[in-house]
Amino acid sequence: FESRRLAKAALSFFDSSLLPGKAVLCRLLLARIAQRTNDLATAHKESSAAIEKLTDMQAPMLKHQAFLLMGQIHSTSGNRKEAYDCFRTSRQALEMLRSNLRGQELKMAFLKNRLEVYELLVDACLGGQYSSESLAEAFGYIEEAKSRTLMDQMLQPVYSAGEDSGQSDLVRRMRNLRDELNWYYSLIELEQLRPEQRSPDHIKRLEEQVRARETDLIRVLQESNVSGESVSGMQSGKSLSLEEIRAALTRETLVVEYFQTGDRILACLLGADQLQIVPVTLASRIANVLRLLQFQLSKFRLGTEYAAAFRDSLIESTKAHLKTLYDELLAPLRDRLDAPHLLFVPHGALHYVPFHALFDGERFVIDEHTVSYAPSASIYAVCTKKQVNTDGPALLMGVPDQNAPSILEELEALKAILPDPQMFVGKSASEYILKNAGPGARLIHIATHGFFRQDSPMFSSIRMGSSYLSLYDLYQLRLPVELVTLSGCATGLNVVAAGDELIGLARGLFQAGAQSLLLSLWDVHDQSTADFMTEFYRRLQSGEDKAQAMRAAMLAVREAYPHPYQWAPFVLMGKYAK
């Protein structure tokens, strides 16, 4: 009641002032208070007054908020048609706002807590009888809510900061900060590799220095406008239409795209001549199972002796969690998964699910289908149309150490398989080589340690010969290649930000121009990874497409290494077919 009194007092003041936007906000606050106390008549009255006042104002954010609230009031009152119309108007205002933003960090921050209107529109489209038109419209809203900023960046030219950019001071500051960060990263890694001499206090001090410089680097990148933003002045692109996406699919492909509305998870099944949207489970049921699976996979960090001693129980426990995930996410779709190739488009926490390794009690998904992944169906379609090198060398790079001695064996095996290989090992596997040889390569394979930063995903990195290559560094590379493989630990992990934006190495590689990626979802086993990569590239050279080669490599490695931790860490993203 106190909040209502204060809102009315503020409204009385702003109604007589030259700040009509503030008066609208007061009306919306009064409407929200009434809605939450179930006084729908007052809520409708205040929202209507706010919308009427907006008629003569250019205030798209207020328009978005007002029509979203009015739609929710209509929905609660059972007025589905009126609610739907309000949600559409709210979305249009939001899209107009987003299209005029510059800088991908700003766009992603803008979407935080503003995706509700897309969820409500999906629910509104599916609230009545499912028609082909309502299904297509719902699918369009689902695509609009996924990885839009990444697609914007993929559609715009790559910009690399150079001395001729007119920003030489900023460029020098960036380089100095990157050099300092690489030095501190190396010191931290050296400390961690010496457990008997490790000083937690010293590591903590080094990490404080790292965080300070990372903050400075983010600030400089934002100033210089090279953190992934085009200098062409292009506005935000839209998600592709249903028919544009369909045109990119082969008849053997079924897109399985998930979307969460509230606690409910929906699955969209899109093929060359079908579109279905099926409720499958609740997000709250998935979260705990996924944590248990990740806990099981983390047990391999306890060492090879532990893994060998408890081999059978580790396998059975992991398969049990994979079976539960199958029952929740795929069993409701079992009779509809009739395509040879499944293209999974996850949402939210489902980006951490290894769908290819889900288990029905007898067989894994990869036993029945080839599998690939994409951040959105629109991004998959964009990947199929990318202009990339169809010939050129295979660029092989690796940084072996005592924790990954099989990296050299892996590279030597690939050198014998791939045509026109260029191999760089150790210190010679540098960022300079990648920057200069990468643009002309057809394939790039980097075997090294990956570092996923949950606390600051923009600084997730891979170790190069004398530096660490982060997401920000990838933003400034041009890599128009058919395939980039990172065969290190957790190179495919991302933080899922607002708008289902993936913040990790995959983002930087797609933006740099790669058509497809082969990355890992968790820490990888050294020898099984070498065996997997050898079989994958051998199959690729024999004429199989990337998805077929990945499936064959997984099945071959599983014969010797039956635990999913060892045979199932890798995911193929982007274009999979020839």
PLM regions with names:
Residues 44, 48, 64, 80-363, ...:
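Amphipathic alpha-helical protein-protein interaction segments
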Residues 1-2, 14-29, 56-66:
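Alpha-solenoid helical repeat architecture
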Residues 5, 228-578:
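Catalytic cores of enzymes
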Residues 2-5, 42-45:
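Structural signature of tandem alpha-helical TPR/SEL1-like repeats
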